[in-house]
Design a protein with these regions (language model features):
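Polybasic (Lys/Arg-rich)
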Residues: 172-272
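Bulky hydrophobic/aromatic content
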Residues: 22-110
């Protein structure tokens, strides 16, 4: 009886595991395979940034789940991103290729009435602790980026499928951008060379920007050209957009723009 229970229990665990693996494959598009040589299950593309972010979130969730109420020993950022409640319905609409209607306002005109926008959502983007959706604006007949924190209501238009073809290579739309600011019509990616001075001291509260940027690159195109005793020189290929300029300004005198000249001139003017 015990051996039969063990066999049945083992079969149940195996079926549960296979079902979970199937759900992960279908929902998150992550492939998990069994390594026969070690008899262990492995994620086949664990170097992918998307997979790494999911695993990081799972690590945090598992730690919190294992230890119960930790409010006395763990403190979270109080400035929580708004609009995350729309992630799930937008993701569902993306998967099912369905239109949704947004009730949307602009930050600089928040007192005015919300605008209604019917969109065909293609991609969700996180940047600087905010979420955005890249979508086809049906009324404007153009690609637009909408901040989820500016959505007041979302109506799920379940019966209406996409009427516009999904643009080719839409997943690469933000590749040349620092965050979610794209400005395709006027801005092209440029080569930017930056020198970050090394601080004489390095603390938890004031990290050395040169070392910090090795661990947390400014952009996926970042390359280290050279590292000297007093500075590190980085090269990027990126669109020079207002959010990128704001990021550079946050480093103050610790960053020097080597190229292009017009970026150096713009930063100098803003620092006065």
């Amino acid at each position: 009886k015990d051996s039969e229970d063990n066999v049945e229990g083992g079969d149940l665990l195996q079926r549960t595991l296979q079902r979970d693996i199937q759900v992960i494959r279908e929902v998150y598009n992550i492939e998990i395979k069994c390594n026969r040589s070690t008899n262990e299950y492995e994620i086949t593309e664990d170097n992918d940034l998307y997979v790494q972010n999911l695993l990081e979130a799972f690590d945090v969730f598992r730690a919190l789940q294992n230890y119960g109420n930790l409010s006395e020993v763990i403190q979270f950022e109080k400035r929580l991103p708004a609009g995350t409640e729309y992630l799930s319905p937008l993701l569902r609409a993306i998967k099912e290729k369905r239109q949704v209607k947004l009730h949307y306002y602009k930050f600089w005109d928040r007192s005015s009435q919300t605008q209604e926008r019917t969109i065909e959502p293609y991609l969700l983007k996180e940047a600087q602790r905010r979420w955005y959706v890249l979508a086809w604006d049906v009324e404007k007949e153009a690609l637009r980026v909408f901040g989820l924190d500016r959505i007041k209501r979302l109506d799920d238009e379940r019966g209406v499928k996409f009427q516009h073809p999904v643009p080719k290579d839409v997943e690469h739309y933000f590749d040349d951008s620092f965050g979610a600011w794209v400005d395709n019509e006027r801005t092209q990616a440029e080569e930017v060379v930056l020198a970050f001075r090394k601080l004489p001291t390095d603390t938890v509260f004031i990290p050395n920007p040169a070392k910090y940027l090795e661990a947390m690159p400014l952009h996926s195109s970042q390359q280290i050209l050279k590292e000297e005793e007093e500075a590190i020189v980085l090269r990027l290929r990126i669109k020079i957009t207002p959010d990128f300029i704001k990021e550079l300004l946050s480093y103050g005198k610790q960053v020097e723009i080597l190229t292009p000249a017009h970026l150096q001139e713009e930063l100098t003017a803003k620092q006065k």
